């Protein structure tokens, strides 16, 4: 199913994005004012997490010309079905309800997905995930963004895989050409402020 809505029509579904649905019943109108009433995400969080999981191979990708290379998701040949159950443009503060998330999980089960990737923290939805696991679906949840202490990790049900980001032990050297044509190698550091301003 490719559900049509604001900023999203049937042409947005393809051989890569094979389905799209959105859920907003019960979400306050104020929370939806800066959001697309469609499977499209206003803050790119869903796009980011989907590309991390299943992004196609893109040669010569870079960030404003820096750190050029090949970008790809963990499973670049995988197809994506979008079930947008949380809305809201504030980073880390989406608006949704247990009902919208459970409806999305139920639809994903019915549609026969192989993997559910949920980048949200809603502990009470772990039983929806249990139903998916009982149907043979691998369920992967985000651990959250609350810090490094074990007690702040969300989505800890024993039947789901909980993933988190970590610091990496490598740098991204980038060649910079100065006005006098001298080239120097520098380490690239990208901050949230820079990303938000771009």
Named regions from a protein language model:
Residues 36, 95-105, 116-121, 195-198:
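Extracellular/luminal Protease-associated
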Residues 46, 98-102, 113, 126:
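Generic preference for well-ordered alpha-helical elements
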Residues 1-6, 109-189:
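Catalytic-core segments of hydrolase enzymes
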């Amino acid at each position: 199913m490719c559900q049509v809505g604001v900023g999203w029509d049937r042409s947005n579904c393809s051989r890569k994005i094979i389905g799209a649905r959105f859920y907003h019943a019960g979400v306050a109108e104020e929370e939806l004012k800066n959001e697309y009433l469609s499977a499209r995400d206003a803050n790119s969080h869903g796009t980011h997490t989907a590309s991390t999981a299943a992004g196609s191979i893109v040669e010569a990708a870079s960030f404003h010309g820096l750190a050029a290379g090949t970008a790809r998701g963990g499973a670049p040949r995988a197809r994506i079905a979008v079930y947008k159950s949380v809305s809201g443009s504030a980073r880390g503060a989406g608006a949704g309800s247990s009902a919208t998330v459970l409806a999305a999980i139920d639809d994903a089960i019915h549609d026969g997905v192989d993997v559910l990737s949920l980048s949200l923290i809603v502990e009470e939805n772990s039983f929806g995930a249990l139903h998916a696991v009982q149907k043979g679906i691998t369920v992967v949840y985000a651990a959250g963004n609350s810090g490094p202490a074990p007690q702040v990790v969300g989505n800890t049900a024993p039947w789901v895989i909980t993933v988190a980001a970590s610091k990496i032990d490598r740098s991204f050297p980038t060649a910079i050409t100065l006005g006098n044509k001298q080239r120097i190698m520098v380490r690239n550091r990208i901050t949230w402020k820079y990303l938000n301003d771009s």
